[in-house]
């Protein structure tokens, strides 16, 4: 008989957080935490955006955990929020507004939590950035490349598969 087994998601894995941090750092933005002007500018906002889901069971708690991991790794001078590109909460607009109004950011780096560029990136994420620019015209916006192909993602996926086999064979 054929058995179907569900593995855990990539979820809030430190390796995934590390990739996101590298995407932010790849832009070469200076984090001026020691600069006297930083008080006026506030921290750099990082908005990690995943594909939206209509799944009623995806409460995005795992994604919020991942966002906290990223903020802890980036350290002082950064404020991280997470959002869904469409269909669900938190929305790109709401998360960006929280970064600006509650965390005081003057710059937002958007990190697409996607494996490759495509329709979701073009229509939903970049479209969301257009809305952010209209709502918050003084906020500087930039976007990193998607996660792409990375050995750490492969390692996380392999770990999830091994966990399933361990349960099945154990």
Where are these regions (language model features)?
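Extended amphipathic ligand-handling, pore-lining, and cofactor/metal-binding catalytic surfaces
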Residues: 1-170
């Amino acid at each position: 008989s054929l058995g179907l087994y569900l593995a855990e998601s990539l979820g809030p894995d430190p390796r995934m957080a590390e990739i996101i941090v590298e995407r932010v750092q790849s832009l070469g933005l200076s984090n001026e935490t020691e600069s006297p002007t930083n008080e006026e500018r506030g921290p750099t906002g990082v908005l990690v955006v995943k594909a939206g889901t209509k799944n009623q069971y995806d409460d995005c708690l795992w994604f919020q955990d991942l966002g906290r991991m990223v903020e802890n790794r980036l350290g002082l001078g950064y404020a991280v929020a997470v959002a869904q590109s469409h269909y669900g909460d938190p929305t790109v607009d709401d998360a960006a507004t929280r970064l600006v109004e509650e965390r005081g950011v003057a710059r937002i780096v958007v990190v697409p939590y996607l494996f490759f560029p495509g329709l979701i990136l073009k229509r939903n994420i970049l479209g969301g950035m257009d809305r952010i620019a209209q709502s918050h015209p003084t906020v500087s916006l930039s976007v990193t490349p998607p996660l792409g192909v990375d050995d750490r993602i492969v390692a996380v996926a392999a770990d999830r598969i091994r966990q399933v086999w361990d349960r099945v064979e154990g």
